[in-house]
Amino acid sequence: MFKPELLSPAGTLKNMRYAFAYGADAVYAGQPRYSLRVRNNEFNHENLQLGINEAHALGKKFYVVVNIAPHNAKLKTFIRDLKPVVEMGPDALIMSDPGLIMLVREHFPEMPIHLSVQANAVNWATVKFWQQMGLTRVILSRELSLEEIEEIRNQVPDMEIEIFVHGALCMAYSGRCLLSGYINKRDPNQGTCTNACRWEYNVQEGKEDDVGNIVHKYEPIPVQNVEPTLGIGAPTDKVFMIEEAQRPGEYMTAFEDEHGTYIMNSKDLRAIAHVERLTKMGVHSLKIEGRTKSFYYCARTAQVYRKAIDDAAAGKPFDTSLLETLEGLAHRGYTEGFLRRHTHDDYQNYEYGYSVSDRQQFVGEFTGERKGDLAAVAVKNKFSVGDSLELMTPQGNINFTLEHMENAKGEAMPIAPGDGYTVWLPVPQDLELNYALLMRNFSGETTRNPHGK
């Protein structure tokens, strides 16, 4: 049966290596200055070449993201800066701006181009247009339903399509947001988003003054035990002022229409339950978001979605335990996004803007060093003798209770204190530990309070 590509994020070479070790078929990484993760991008030209070479040596693919919305100044140096990247031999460029796409088609006509999600492709005519422009794949907008994706697949059957299946969602249409730029002059479309949508805001009632400006009313609004009711009833005729917690006294106006108020913090996408249907549709690539995430995130998401894809291709039923495994990653709550239609409160997290897990915490990375039955672990977070742990490897996972660990001198250690320490754990000598990771299973704790009930 047809098997879609599993495409993982690579914010660093280490993330790339873990993604490949745990089953990714391809990774994507940003070109310096021209992608939307310029603040969190390890990749310079040297690392790009290393990554491309390592991917190809493994029979994998490496895509370079060039999806910035450029102003004129960026055009002056674009071809000069891109030429050495093209010469490295990436498998495709991921692009959104029609002008930059035109320049690449003119100067590097053999270079495959994938249309970025930033281009907002939401219908089959758009996909067909970009096919006629010579692109080889379109990454569809996250705002599409399963039925819309299937119609696009049927209308343009000879064009590759790619779908996001996991990771953060943006409050704006395919990430075309102005909020960060408006509040603190960091333009998301130039790769410097500060995730202002995740911040804590206070909402206070305002009023319209004599000349039509929205001004502060200076009267508190009593709010107690309010449940989200978006999509129910008529929109309010009130206007409101938003105050971000770290910017007291700075107010922005907010309105409500028939869709609700746009505040503002989306849950994370988790579409693993739909991998089987997307596979049957013939979607060519299933993509995981997260170029700013950890190597543990890259490893775990690759492992879980690898199994889901393999099971779907083999005709096996969906393994619901994979949903629980993904709960072990810190997240903002999960949603299926727009793949199936929900009420608005299923999309949004109204309680907090940070990522958290009440199932597991990543606590250590096996270094590869061994002393007999002991293996070295570089500690990342605190754990103790008696804890329930999971040892995760590309070959499979093992849950166990930690009964003993030592320091480098062979002295017993009841506690691995935290980042910067190395401890030695008993591990069978025949167990392969390349890319092995260690997680602590919670019992009433969370990653926000990992050692308190």
Swiss-Prot record:
Impact when changing C177A: Reduced 5-carboxymethoxyuridine formation in tRNAs
Result after altering E162A: Reduced 5-carboxymethoxyuridine formation in tRNAs
Enzyme class: hydrolase
Keywords: Hydrolase, Protease, tRNA processing
Knockout mutant characteristics: Deletion mutant cells display reduced 5-methoxycarbonylmethoxyuridine (mcmo5U) formation in tRNA(Ala1), tRNA(Ser1) and tRNA(Thr4). Reduced 5-carboxymethoxyuridine (cmo5U) formation in tRNA(Val1). Strongly reduced cmo5U formation in tRNA(Leu3) and tRNA(Pro3). Cells lacking both trhP and trhO show complete absence of 5-carboxymethoxyuridine (cmo5U) modification in tRNAs; cells display a temperature-sensitive phenotype and decode codons ending in G (GCG and UCG) less efficiently than the wild-type strain.
EC number: 3.4.-.-
A GO term, aspect molecular function: peptidase activity
Cross-referenced PROSITE patterns: PEPTIDASE_U32
Cross-referenced Gene3D superfamilies: Translation factors (2.40.30.10)
One GO BP: tRNA modification
GO cellular component: cytosol
Record function comment: Involved in prephenate-dependent formation of 5-hydroxyuridine (ho5U) modification at position 34 in tRNAs, the first step in 5-carboxymethoxyuridine (cmo5U) biosynthesis. Involved differently in ho5U formation in each tRNA; tRNA(Leu3) and tRNA(Pro3) are major targets of TrhP.
PANTHER family assigned: PEPTIDASE U32 FAMILY, TRNA HYDROXYLATION PROTEIN P
Family that this chain belongs to: Belongs to the peptidase U32 family.
Name by which UniProt lists this protein: tRNA hydroxylation protein P
Organism, scientific name: Escherichia coli (strain K12)
Name of the gene encoding the protein in the UniProt record: trhP
